[in-house]
Curated annotation (Swiss-Prot):
Catalysed reaction, written as an equation: 4-imidazolone-5-propanoate = trans-urocanate + H2O
The keyword Electron transport belongs to this UniProt entry's keyword annotation: no
Keyword ATP-binding in record: no
Family: Belongs to the urocanase family.
Entry's localization field: Cytoplasm
Source species: Stenotrophomonas maltophilia (strain K279a)
SUPFAM superfamilies: Urocanase
Disulfide bonds: none
Protein name per Swiss-Prot or TrEMBL: Urocanate hydratase
GO cellular component term, pick one: cytoplasm
Gene designation per UniProt: hutU
Cofactor comment text: Binds 1 NAD(+) per subunit.
Length: 555
């Protein structure tokens, strides 16, 4: 079992020459490889895409076997992938998924980091995060619009919709957290983001998500102060330990206008640098003494939350951004760790009630012009949404593609299927140079159960009911998605979430159009269904408006 191979450099093929037997198998092949592109993955030589140890394949032997299997797979066969390892090929039918993926799922009694890490060390499991092991990660862009929408809503609720001259403090510039600086600037606020790894800061600078950096707190604060006074938002990365820096700001009485965090706190061994440790010590001890790392990291997380609570008490809008930091602190004795809310119940849930979430697509041609054309098609088909148009304009101007050109665009029920069918027609008539794939984050309205994040504080108390993502995966399979995934532990760690993903290929065929129409209607409809069942009036109204047949919910 080879987990680390510095000699490997992976990039997705581009153009129209097939390496597999059809676009239905070429697409997962390219997207798997794209997940490990050096400009996409955090540690590609270790197969780590993002989020601590979120991998694309269990080991390099499994990666090679997946690639070879996809190349020979027929269009009436389905490949089964178990925690990043290809385990079977079975005869199904042309409208069945070409790949079915299950990653890091454990029986609830054993669904904890200790048991998972034991399996992981034996080579029996793989942590797939959300889009790492489901082969639809598109770099930091994948989370940037959701982060932008959150910051815009924070500005609307707390500052009358204007973040000019305001600044956000946060931690973490990894694959998810790296979206925060650009999202803040897009929303009109400056951002001070603390990151312990210089390599992560360098990647955000290289890909355009961060404006500048320093290793000196006073210099960082000077840069933030200058940008706020000028009314020109700027993002500053600070090399350091976020728990130390936030405590120092509280001690000095320096108050940010907004406060959150996106360190990989969900994984106390691999995701959070303990206070007083160097990164080199941490990297060594993660292997040699993981229990010592976990103990020290958890203590630091508790201090981190205490500082956040201090600012919350001072009136600073403070929000958990879904990394389970509050839970870790609660388990370390911080009884009021949940005094400030998570971002979904505070800012995003009304969108989920209408099935609106992180719709994304990637151009298999590798040509950025294909994304420009699809951006224009979105504007054409959704002409009366200036907020969406502004997002697309900003994305085109400010977001650098990582790996295959891609776009993230939050749209909901009734729009996703229209866009998918339009993209398929653009492939059919030659407007696009090659097929596109359409997928989404597992962070969506109907595809996740995560009581400390997406399903926190549900109106009916159904936060932990995980039937919904299972039904979502089953329905997407029945509807004809090209690949479907069912994961455990993404975002918030082992024992705290179950979630499902889907990807569908627009190859320009009539058969694809039928699948697209089913999948891209049914997938967001499950989100409306889930929230209607929980009693949200917005979702109930949406379900009635769209004519959903929900017999046990609408009567």
């Amino acid at each position: 079992m080879t987990r680390n191979d510095p000699s490997r450099t992976i990039a997705a093929p581009t153009g129209t020459t097939l390496n597999a037997k059809s676009w239905l198998t070429e697409a997962p092949l390219r997207m798997l490889m794209n997940n490990l592109h050096p400009d996409v993955a955090e540690r590609p030589q270790e197969l780590v895409v993002y989020g601590g140890i979120g991998r694309a394949a269990r080991d390099w032997e499994s990666f090679d076997a997946i690639v070879e299997t996809l190349k020979r797979l027929d269009d009436d066969q389905t490949l089964l992938v178990q925690s990043g390892k290809p385990v079977g090929v079975f005869r199904t039918h042309a409208d069945a998924p070409r790949v079915l993926i299950a990653n890091s799922n454990l029986v609830p009694r054993w669904a904890n980091w200790d048991h998972f890490n034991e399996l992981d060390r034996k080579g029996l499991a793989m942590y797939g995060q959300m889009t790492a092991g489901s082969w639809i990660y598109i770099g930091a862009q994948g989370i940037v619009q959701g982060t932008y929408e959150t910051f815009v809503e924070m500005g609307r609720q707390h500052f009358g919709g204007d973040l000019t001259g305001k600044w956000l403090f946060t931690g973490g510039l990894g694959g998810m957290g790296g979206a925060q600086p650009l999202a803040a600037v897009m929303a009109g606020a400056s951002c001070l983001a603390v990151e312990c790894r210089k390599s992560s800061i360098d990647m955000r600078l290289r890909t355009g998500y961060l404006d500048t950096w320093t290793d000196n707190l006073d210099e960082a604060l000077r840069l933030i102060d200058e940008s706020c006074k000028a009314g020109t938002p700027k993002s500053v990365g600070l090399l350091g330990n976020v728990a130390d820096v936030l405590a120092e700001l509280l001690k000095r009485g320096v108050k940010p206008d907004l406060l959150t965090d996106q360190t990989s706190a969900h994984d106390p061994v691999n995701g959070y640098l303990p206070q007083g440790w160097t990164v080199e010590q941490w990297d060594e001890k993660r292997v040699s003494a993981p229990k010592d790392v976990e103990k020290a990291a958890r203590a630091s997380m508790a201090n981190h939350i205490r500082a956040m609570l201090g600012f919350h008490a001072l009136g600073v809008p403070t929000v958990d951004y879904g990394n389970n930091l509050r839970q870790m602190a609660l388990e370390e004795g911080v009884a009021n760790a949940f005094d400030f809310p998570g971002f979904v119940p505070a800012y995003i849930r009304p969108l989920f009630c209408r099935g609106i979430g992180p719709f994304r697509w990637a151009a298999l041609s590798g040509d950025p012009e294909d994304i420009a054309k699809t951006d224009a098609k979105v504007k054409e088909l959704i002409p009366d949404n200036p907020h969406l148009h502004r997002w697309l304009d900003m994305a085109a101007e400010k977001i650098k593609f990582q790996g295959l050109p891609a776009r993230i665009c939050w749209v909901g029920l009734g729009d996703r299927d229209r866009l998918g069918l339009a993209f398929n027609e653009m492939v059919a008539n030659g407007e696009l140079k090659a097929p596109v794939v359409i997928g989404r984050d597992h962070l969506d309205s109907g595809s996740v159960a995560s009581p400390n994040r997406e399903t926190e504080a549900m109106a009916d108390g159904s936060d932990a009911v995980s039937d919904w993502p299972l039904l979502n995966a089953l329905l997407n399979t029945a509807s004809g998605a090209t690949w479907v995934s069912l994961h455990h532990g993404g975002g918030v760690g082992m024992g705290f979430s179950q979630h499902a993903g889907m990807v569908i290929v627009c190859d320009g065929t009539e058969a694809a159009a039928k699948r697209i129409g089913r999948v891209l209607w049914n997938d967001p409809a499950t989100g409306v269904m889930r929230h209607a069942d929980a009693g949200y009036d917005i979702a109930i109204d949406c379900a009635k408006e769209k004519g959903l047949d929900l017999p046990g919910i609408l009567g």
